[in-house]
A protein has these predicted regions:
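Ribosome large-subunit tunnel/peptidyl-transferase-proximal elements
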Residues: 1-108, 118, 136-150
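Hydrophobic, well-ordered secondary-structure segments
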Residues: 106-107, 111, 124
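C-terminal structural segments of small proteins and small subunits
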Residues: 120-130, 136
Length: 150
């Protein structure tokens, strides 16, 4: 490159290079884990970050059942959903969610940290959460990253 270019190069769908990464959630605080995962999903850790393009990596979170919540958050925090019927509000605690579907707890925390737009809906599709240490994505050759390396 002999001349300087003063144009900002934005990524697009064709030029984005996505990787697969694995994050082990064992003994990690839910909020800290979710914020780092959201950062990688969005692509903000890459130098070519473009806000309107899905330029993040595909993230696999394993051992979601071993995530921790500090203090009394296991029992005091309440997740609310609505069935659509009168009087249909349903309340659940993280302890109940962790007992039934541990992956849902991590997925819900990460989704809350992504944009509330169509792009955010696309990005959450790049998140794969599994309760145990096994995952079916070995063919993608994911690289393992530690939480403090992001």
């Amino acid at each position: 490159m002999d001349t300087l270019s003063y144009k900002t190069v934005s990524l697009n769908k064709a030029t984005v290079q996505k990787e697969w990464v694995v994050i082990d959630a064992t003994d990690l605080a839910l909020g800290r884990l979710a914020s780092r995962v959201a950062l990688v999903l969005r692509g903000k850790n890459k130098p070519g970050f473009t806000p309107h393009v899905d330029c993040g990596d595909n993230v696999i979170v394993i051992n979601a059942e071993k995530v921790i919540l500090k203090g009394d958050k296991m029992t005091d925090r309440v997740y609310v959903r609505y069935t659509g019927y009168p009087g249909g509000q349903r309340f659940t605690t993280p302890r109940e969610i962790l007992a039934k579907r541990p992956a849902e707890l991590v997925r819900r925390a990460v989704k809350g940290m992504l944009p509330k737009t169509r792009l955010g809906d696309m990005i959450i599709g790049n998140l794969h959460v599994y309760a145990g240490p096994e995952h079916p994505h070995q063919a993608q050759n994911p690289r393992e990253i530690k939480l403090n390396e992001i």
